[in-house]
Amino acid sequence: MSRQSLSSPALGQRKGLISHTVDLVRALLFDRRYFWHTAFLLFLGEVALSLLVIWKIPYTKIDWPAYMQQVDMFLAGERDYSKIEGETGPLVYPALHLYIYTAFHRLLPSIENVRPAQFVFLGFYLATYLAISTIYYLAGRPSNGGHHFPQVLLIPLTLSKRAHSIFLLRLFNDPIAMLIFYLSVIAFQIGGRKGWRLGCVLFSLALGVKMNILNFLPGLLVLLFQYRGIVGTVEGLSIIGLIQFLLPAPFFFSKSNPYLIRAYFTSAFDFSRQFLYEWTVNWRFISEETFLSRERAVTLLAGHLTVLGLFAAFKWSPVPGGTLRVLRKGFSDPLNQALEVSQVPAYHIPLVLFSANLIGMLFARSLHYQFHSWYFHQLPFLLYSGAGWGNMLTSVLIWVTVQYAWETAPSTISTSAALLAGHGAMVFGLFFHGMKRPSSSQKSKAK
């Protein structure tokens, strides 16, 4: 018997083992049946890595002391929102932000010892990961021409130094607002009258922490009209508005002074606030004079509204007849939804919301480093949905470029230009290569 024949069984076993391993890895990364297996493995990795970050890397003192100083003034009885301030300046966040950090102030053993707060933010970080995983999973339900969002998209969510820093080392309010917002997206995806009402409640609570949630509002208006009709849209907006009025009630009713109402809203929702040029991440390549100019602000607002209008008109109603048909049906039957849910894929809701936010990021007057959390968890979803121009290599290149810009501190002319180019490429990609209206053949396959 030859040596080759003796070794052939072992060789066959080795090839079989390699083939089995490759199949297992492929299933863990792409097979919907193994979505939560992979998500859980990544979750465990995030737990270990995050604990290591908290243990090994010092907390960064930026806004936490100012938050606590603002809380001190609130607890001391100050109810004029315009007078509440800390070492970094006046309080510019809505009331729920103040209440959350008041809870930290009350419940933590010491506001000087931030380690317990870091573990709370670790909880926020892990909850955000689970929430976004749920959004990806629900978006991948194979119905109405939709398709699976593979769990390989979750891997980039674990690779950002900036994201870990924002959540675990700096204790900003941005992650809290985004976690509540992601919970609202899940409620919208679950759907039904109760789901949309709960989603609007959660959306408003997120807005009550930070006004960046307004970036998602144009997309939400479109979705409310599509899924809930005119009456449902009015109901949803009423829920959001009522909560925004109830949250600051302690400031309104402490004294019979109408000025306090105006002081709250002009402080918590100050659209005219000037940003410091030294902290900008996305506009370093222009002069400070141009950065602070009113003309630039007006131009950016006009561009923002124009692109939102284009997406609303041509991209956000992926049904036969498009936006005109949706509008016609909505206004002719205001009590019912303006489109058939069976006509749109499961990813429609997060895609509209996330793309509206990305447009806001593109035209933002300034982005600071903590604003990275406003869209970081959405990027793999958007790139897979067309922002990567339908090409894996392009998607990876855009993601790496954007992350490099955020990881470089302080920002430079080149990193700001790269970030703006990355945002522009993603918005154009979504518009020209975004997921198209499912064809009749796709729908029949989905059934």
Curated annotation (Swiss-Prot):
The keyword Plastid does not apply. It is found in: Endoplasmic reticulum membrane. Signal peptide: none annotated. It holds the Pfam family ALG3. GO terms for cellular component: endoplasmic reticulum membrane. The chain crosses the membrane at residues 35-55, 84-104, 119-139, 171-191, 205-225, 233-253, 297-317, 344-364, 380-400, 412-432. Residues 56-83, 140-170, 226-232, 318-343, 401-411 are cytoplasmic. GO terms for biological process: protein glycosylation. Keywords: Endoplasmic reticulum, Glycosyltransferase, Membrane, Transferase, Transmembrane, Transmembrane helix. It is a multi-pass membrane protein. This is Dol-P-Man:Man(5)GlcNAc(2)-PP-Dol alpha-1,3-mannosyltransferase. The gene is ALG3. It comes from Cryptococcus neoformans var. neoformans serotype D (strain B-3501A). Pathway: Protein modification; protein glycosylation. Belongs to the glycosyltransferase ALG3 family.
